[in-house]
């Protein structure tokens, strides 16, 4: 991502006003943007995240900080920046989190820098108490889903209609993304399959212990894995139902699928085109 941004700005910085970046902790964003005299807009999900970015990097190039995008972990679609201490099933209201972010920014003399609220924004009338609010300070709002429903939007009409009929409980905040981050998406058959597949999952060790004391042999080479006694009966039942192929995950677990599904997964891993800097699904990493 850093190389792509650098090369893009080398060729087109005269027509680019600013760049935004999230999906992790983009420490190098400010350095690259400032080198070309371009504003940068980091995406964060908490005051804690911005504090780390500021102290490590952004304080050196504060003149080019155009704004801070607050992407709410529970309201925004796509990938979300939940920390290990936050419960994905217990949403927190955005106001106190943005107020905390503004308070921190004020400590760094960033009162003039706007916060851009992203996630759950549909109509400005729902956010009137945020506007001209001293606790929030300069604020702007990012519309993500609503523009998808316009006539100019190229997405299929069926998808536009689906977005207009989503009911409470039909959006899933899950951790199936190959990035390793939580992601929010409308529930569909694919997500249903992933949830069911996740339930057919057992931890394992390659060496026997008092807890992992049940041996199972996998594949033509009879590779030995050890699972908990409490999981052995589940595995026997899954195999009986046709989920006879175990596949290892980056989390040292076995997921049990059908032979057909296993073949499809392996093919998809082989066909990986490297769209991420690091992918937990295909084991691809740009640094390896």
Predicted feature residues:
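Generic beta-sheet signal
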Residues: 43, 118, 143-144
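Conserved active-site-proximal phosphate/metal-binding subdomains
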Residues: 75-92, 104-112, 124-288
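A short glycine-centered flexible hinge/capping loop motif at secondary-structure junctions
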Residues: 116-123
């Amino acid at each position: 991502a850093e190389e792509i941004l650098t090369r893009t700005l080398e060729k087109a910085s005269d027509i680019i006003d600013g760049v935004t970046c999230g999906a992790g902790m983009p420490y190098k964003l400010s350095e690259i943007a400032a080198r070309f005299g371009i504003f940068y807009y980091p995406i964060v999900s908490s005051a804690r995240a911005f504090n780390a970015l500021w102290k490590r990097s952004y304080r050196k190039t504060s003149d080019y900080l155009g704004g801070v995008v607050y992407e709410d972990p529970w309201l925004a679609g796509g990938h979300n920046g939940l920390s290990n201490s936050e419960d994905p099933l217990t949403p927190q209201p955005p106001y106190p989190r943005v107020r905390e972010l503004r308070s921190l920014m004020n400590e760094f003399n960033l009162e003039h820098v706007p916060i851009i609220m992203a996630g759950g924004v549909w109509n400005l009338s729902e956010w009137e108490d945020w506007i001209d609010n001293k606790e929030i300070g300069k604020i702007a709002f990012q519309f993500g889903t609503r523009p998808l429903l316009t006539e100019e939007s190229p997405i299929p009409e069926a998808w536009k209609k689906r977005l207009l009929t989503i009911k409470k409980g039909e959006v899933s905040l899950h951790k199936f993304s190959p990035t390793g981050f939580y992601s929010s998406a409308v529930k569909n058959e694919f997500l249903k399959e992933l949830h069911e597949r996740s339930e057919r999952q057992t931890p394992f060790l390659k060496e026997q212990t008092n807890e992992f004391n049940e041996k199972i042999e996998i594949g033509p080479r009879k590779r030995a894995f050890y699972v908990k006694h409490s999981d052995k009966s589940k595995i026997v039942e899954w195999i009986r139902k046709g989920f006879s192929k175990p596949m290892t995950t980056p989390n040292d677990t076995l997921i049990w699928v059908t032979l057909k599904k296993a073949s499809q997964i392996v093919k998809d891993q082989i066909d990986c085109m490297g769209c991420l800097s690091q992918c937990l699904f295909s084991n691809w990493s740009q640094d390896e």
